[in-house]
Amino acid sequence: MRIPRGTYRGIEEGTHWHNYTFYSYNKLNSLFRPRLSYELACFIEDHGWEAVAHYPAVPEGNGTTSEPLRDGIPPDIVCSVRIIAAGCGLGEIGFSKVFLTKEFGPRVRLGLIFTDCELEPDPIIHTGDICLHCGACARECPGNAIPSVKDVNKRITVSLGDTSVWYGDVRMGRCTLSHHGMNNECSPFLKKEFPNMAFDVRSSEMTEEEAYIMSYTMAQGTWGRKPDTNKVMGYYDYIMTHTGYFAICGAKGCIRACMDMLEKTDRIENKFHNRFYYKKSWALPNKPEKVSDGVNPYREEYLDKTYPGIRENEYKKTE
């Protein structure tokens, strides 16, 4: 299912984040696209063939839900919808691991149906038929999650019958931290709440699981001194309440930069009258905005503002 290009405009302009979460990511995957899978499954079964609509997901990770069927075989298997789509000839897994089609480039979400109906296969699209391997995705990724295209040791190769395809070995911990708003460079909301955090996602060694734990704990956390709802990250909680998810980075490298390069080089069919980029993309500095002095800056700033002069001679620094 296509992702409208306009759903990236708000984040690109730094003005509106909801559209990406709703129309590009969570609700496109969980509401709009499954309806197509359902209708297609019904169409197949109307013709006498069984159809199993498969929701793109991840396998259970705690390892305690069931015993393996046999040694070496995990008990809970979820298929990679991107690898299967590549094997079906729908497109190519780009270097950033985002799926690309000849019509829309990276602006697609995938569904999957298993069926006993025999279908004529499409030819597999080879690595590099769509992806330019230009490195734009890696250069523009705010989390430094995508390796250099020149690093042959950072590639994942998958065999699809007689054909092998490859893509970059993405650092999913860094990707998840950026995607879920734990990167000051691409989240004005984190920068507002934690202006001095200066957590360098680009060099983080966090695993994907650790990144998820940190992101969701922060997004759903509360703190008694926060006004109104006491939410640590007010916007993250707000958008999760409305959409059930929160996506903050807006795929700056893996989709936006990739899309722009594919459009400029006529690699994809969906054309536009105007270029996506018309000015340099914004980025926030990761360094602290203001390093406060004092024993307890929070308390001292509050007292100075509320009761001017009350702290006079409270304590003095000595050299």
Language-model segments: residues:
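Short, solvent-exposed secondary-structure capping/transition elements
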Residues: 8-10, 52, 267
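Generic signature of intrinsically disordered, low-complexity segments enriched in small/polar residues
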Residues: 11, 20-28, 102, 117, ...
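Short, glycine-/Ser/Thr-/acidic-enriched flexible segments
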Residues: 4, 120, 263-264
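Catalytic cores of enzyme domains
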Residues: 22, 26-260, 270-278
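C-terminal non-catalytic accessory extensions
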Residues: 255-319
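Generic low-polarity alpha-helical segments
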Residues: 1-2, 146, 317-319
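Residues forming anionic-ligand binding surfaces in small-molecule and nucleic-acid pockets
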Residues: 2-23, 114
